């Protein structure tokens, strides 16, 4: 009996020793692991945070530069008669609309945002359908005169306008090396001052009409478009020629290179949008062949950039609403490259040529 009792005691002692050994080993390993933790763990955590912050800054830097800030856009009606060439300020715009007017001519509406442009023009009179695009850009609207329909619509639509007929220097002035009515000039600075004096808001939270891309858009599925010819009428056509080095298009009108009045540099653009919409003679009792633009609805078009073109749809639901430009194949809103854009609105029958 005594021997069994001793065996039991020794068994318990052995078990206790084994457990103590296991526990001691665990404590030793935990201590050693703690001692082996690198002293720069905190530094690594800080480095990760710095990388994340840099990535965030990089994302900010990728935001488009052409349309930013809360400066309210200023839309200026620009004369496009050959007697007005060369025009001033077009290379400083973020957006230009070119649309038919009477006599087969076109007129331009140039939009500036946060730009200090000393000479802009020649400024010409308003046509009512340009107001649709001033409204969708939430722009202050500058012009020199107006058609009867434009005058009526400016009033009824509550357009914040600046009419050169009612202003002298320094807001508008005439230059001596062009003949009237192709010689009225202005500047963004004097227009902004006049707008403030009239109590117009000069800041805007409105988003861009165009969906600017953060990364360069390459239309890999598009057709070749290194030269694009757009006939607006029997009288007027424009051609854009692509420069693969600058990745921009140079503008020609009626076969003539278009240059800037102030700098002599060629007029260029990063993006071109073509929209096909019919026009017809406006029955306004004047017999002056003034036009009406049928631009409410969904229309075919093209988006052109970096030497390629894709088919798009252009949808405008009302005069005030933004035009939505979508890929004709996918239905998705197109991404437009960071840079200025010319929107050419021409008749549905126009035969645009690509080379």
Positions of predicted regions on the chain:
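Hydrophobic single-pass membrane-insertion segments
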Residues: 23-36
